[in-house]
Amino acid sequence: MHITKLNLVNYRNFKNVKLHFHKGINTVIGENASGKTNLFRAMRLLLDNSMPRSSTKLSEDDFCRSLGPWKGHWIIISCEFSDISSDEASQSLFLHGNGNIDGESEVVTKATYNLIFRPKAHIRQALSILPPGDATALEECLSDVSIEDYETVLTGKSTANFADPEEYKSIVGDFDAIVFPSELNNPAVGVRLPYILNMPNEVSFTFIKALRDVVSDFHNNRTNPLLTLLKNKSGEISPEDFQPIAELIGTLNENIEGLPDVCDIRDDITSTVGDTVGDTYSPNSISIRSSLTDDSDQLFQSLKLFVAESNDVHEGAIHEMSLGGANLLYLTLKLLEFKYQKANQSIANFLLIEEPEAHIHTHIQKSLFDNINYDNTQIIYSTHSSHISEVSNIKNMNIIGVVEGNCEVFQPATGLSDPQCGFVQRYLDAIRSNLLFARSVILVEGDAEEILIPVLFKKVTGLSLDEMGISLVNIRSTGFENIAMLFSDERIKKRCSIITDLDDTFFDTTIRNTDSVPLKKKKKKAQGSKESGQSRKTALDTFCTGNQWLKPFYADHTFEVDFIKSSNSSYLKKIVNDVYVDPATRVTAKGELSNADIAISGVRALTMANHQGKGWFAITLGNAINFKVVIPKYIFEAIKFAHGEFKPELVLKVLSHRYQRIVEHVAEGTMNMRAAEAAGNLVLKTKWETYLAPYETGIEIFSPKWEAFDLLIDDIDDIKAEFIADFPTENNHFLERI
């Protein structure tokens, strides 16, 4: 038996989500504070018998905050099971409580188990007789409701689809239209289960939290996994096999008791008592006995585990192990415990592991979760480790994300064929699997974009893509569709920008008879690239049409050419000496880069990139740029789409960054101007004065406005407009688009 679905309605940060699970290993992925711990707690409320009974009595803090006023609403935690065993114990449990009979066979194959936290009957009755649409009556009815007016019920055999908001309204009520059902106990909610049918007592359920103190667990007889294993094995030892051990223990006890020193102490105690209280009040007899047990269960409890870690030969006790080693050992013992489960000892085994990466090395993470597989145990683990997600089966994956302020759960394999899933599975290595954790994604085709886009954005805005929650992924080809298909309404609801080149020509490609053979080949290749770019655009536009989560953005030519077209030639001229060694080539390159004709400067930019290698060229260029660089429009628009609206707080950070860089730039320029003056170079001094004058004027005008600005009171758009106006020589056009 295994869990197939889990539905959470109005529970903590989940307003209404459905998770899908499969046999074997399942992964729950989500960033910090996404709700992974809340999800596991919900499952524990249903199935973990180590949770106190009182924990099912929820509080107002357990209601989803995005719900608004909680009074009158229900919290629903609903679980569906499949592949229920045909053995008598399983069938009897579910037939009378939770199960749904499969056709004419009268065998239970599926079952539901629900925890419902709802208003008591008198509150539901009062709501049912409210006049439709009467908001005042609803407010009055709920005004005195407290958490004490709520009850927890456990039900089975439910038919309701709790994930459907309309079905929720039909069962609970429509709080907007103020219409509530007259039926107080809708049969779709299921049959209320008697306390004798206690699911947590029928399943084996273990929860391993992220920062678990496993050393304490090993010292506690109730939670020691080694002791559980030994108990299972001790029951298999026949009395005949154990008899020689019992006899040895009996002999050992007799030998200890018969030691001369022990006998002397016994005799001294007897005589001292007699001397003290006299013969009348002295004990009849006194013995000192060895209490080594010959009971097999108690003997096994005395056994302790000693381990030599992989880099050590000394076998030490558990408390001597590293934290990671102890956690790994605890985890493997729990898995072995499930493997040893006796027939019909429990109807199912569940193991929940919270963020195993907390104590386990990355290589062990990958190895453990790549190889772990026990048929009789369903394992569900949460993670924000890209190393674990790399080896996770995408078909068995749930991703928790935030869409418009609400937590939602995505299944990335929904609707994908086996070959498509296989491709995605192979592609998502430890680096690329970051796209599963990010709030939004940008896909690029090459090294230049992967290296330079984060640098450009950081230099210009002072913000990192990581800070924006954007994961930039290098596809290393133009085959974006194979990964972009993950982002859709039915799979992952996250924004994904695609950046690629149109490879349009930027020089005359007319082939003439007078052209040399190499020139003809160059022109023909450029024409072919243009045609391929247009075909790629048509296909990509068609692929993204109608998908609100996907949008392509195109460089007219290539990254290098579009970069220089965006008024960035000065940065390319800075690195000419790093790219070329030959003095003549350096002079020629600088001259061509200064040419306003893109057919000349663009060719040189591309030649430099190809000469050094696009990846190394991007690194060299990244070291040369500063805050004055211009981000090509298509790149900025791709970032803007991926991130969404720039909130005032972010815009303020950008303005602060640019203002500080301008102040530093002027200070540095002033030093250069004074150095030129000291050297007697009046021409250079004058150039610096002319260059710095508009900046100094801008600082003088803008500084009082900046110091007086208060985000809580003033409009961010106003101070942004002032900044643009006061620094007219800056490339601040991007500010108008945020």
Where are these regions (language model features)?
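Switch/communication elements of ASCE P-loop NTPase nucleotide-binding domains
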Residues: 1-48, 305-433, 450-451, 458, ...
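Extended helical coiled-coil dimerization/tether regions that scaffold
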Residues: 210-329, 333-349, 507-508
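Acidic, divalent-metal-binding catalytic cores of TOPRIM
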Residues: 398-738
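Electropositive, glycine-dotted interaction segments
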Residues: 93-233
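Charged C-terminal transducer/switch regions of large nucleotide-driven machines
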Residues: 74-76, 80-83, 117, 138, ...
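Switch/connector loops and helix/strand junctions flanking conserved nucleotide-binding motifs
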Residues: 85-91, 123-127, 215-219, 389-391, ...
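Conserved P-loop NTP-binding catalytic core
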Residues: 40-109
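Conserved catalytic network of the ASCE P-loop NTPase/AAA+ motor domain
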Residues: 31, 68-73, 85, 105-108, ...
